[in-house]
Amino acid sequence: MSFTSDVKKELTRNLATTGALLALVRMNGSVGIFNGLTLSITTENAGTAKYIYQMLQELYEIHAEIRVHQKTTLSKNRVYTVFITEGAGELLDELSLADSLMLDNGVPEFVKNDEFIKKDYLRGAFLSAGALHNPEKGEYQLSIANVYQEHAEDLQEIFRDFGLNARVIERKNRWILYLSKAEEIMDFLTLIGAMKARLKFEEAKIMREMRGLANRQSNFENANIAKSVMAAQEAIDAIQFLNEKKELEQLPPSLKEIARLRLENPEATIKELGELLDPPLGKSGVNHRLRKLVERSNDLKKVES
């Protein structure tokens, strides 16, 4: 089951509300005439279809029919249609959509002016056409697809009412409203009543950040190891060159001693080399002596070239 499906499953366990039903009718509903006025609400999510059916019964005592058919596209998804014959006109009146469903493409004005209905409407909008990327994979993104630009921009206004900086883009004849910041996505999930999903998202975000930190730490350590290995090999090459040229015996005792220890312990760290000296020497002191050997070797090579 996808992360989006998990969120929608949780949302359908919320209480039936007019605001959620209103969004589903506005975004997924279509009016027809078959022995009178009919209303169809379509979704590809079985749980959402059942939720619509239950809300119609609980809120308006309307007994609908759920019809299932297969999509003809390559996706082969099932499509669920909640079909209302008796009471369709009365329902549209109750939802204040009787005069606007086919004419007005935005969010109804009375929704924008009611704090509680706005939250419920957002829940319905996500159930209707929402998607949430798995936070463990790829980028953070929550989106709601809209057929009409006006509706997308009205939703954007509602998002901003709740401090959420949503953006709207056009993609494949749809207007997509989306959030891309993890904190705002978590706030939205809390707002629409998906607390389990919010906690799961936050946990995945933390784990992803910890893995990223561990990878950066590992890369940093590997880079340091590589630098240390290169520096050690450079010193060994310099000492061997000086030895071939009979120059080691001309060096001060402190440099001769560190040269001997470096050759005898090629895999030792700078710290370990320092501890082998008597008296022990710190890392900066060991590095200083090894650099002197490399400089002496380079100077000799310049003279010979």
Curated annotation (Swiss-Prot):
- PROSITE patterns, per the entry: INTEIN_ENDONUCLEASE
Matches recorded under Gene3D superfamilies: Homing endonucleases
Q: Share an example GO biological-process annotation for this protein.
A: regulation of sporulation
Q: Does the keyword DNA-binding apply?
A: yes
Instruction: State the DNA-binding region(s).
Output: 269-302
Q: What terms describe the molecular function in GO for this protein? A: DNA binding; endonuclease activity
- InterPro entries cross-referenced by the UniProt entry: Homing_endonucl (IPR027434), Intein_endonuc_central (IPR004042), Sporu_reg_WhiA_N_dom (IPR018478), Sporulation_regulator_WhiA (IPR003802), Sporulation_regulator_WhiA_C (IPR023054), WhiA_LAGLIDADG_dom (IPR039518)
One family from Pfam that matches here is LAGLIDADG_WhiA
Q: Which UniProt keywords apply?
A: Cell cycle, Cell division, DNA-binding
Does this entry carry the keyword Cell cycle? Answer: yes
Q: Which NCBIfam families match?
A: DNA_bind_WhiA (TIGR00647)
Q: Which family does the record claim for this protein? A: Belongs to the WhiA family.
* Role: Involved in cell division and chromosome segregation.
* Name of the protein this chain belongs to: Probable cell division protein WhiA
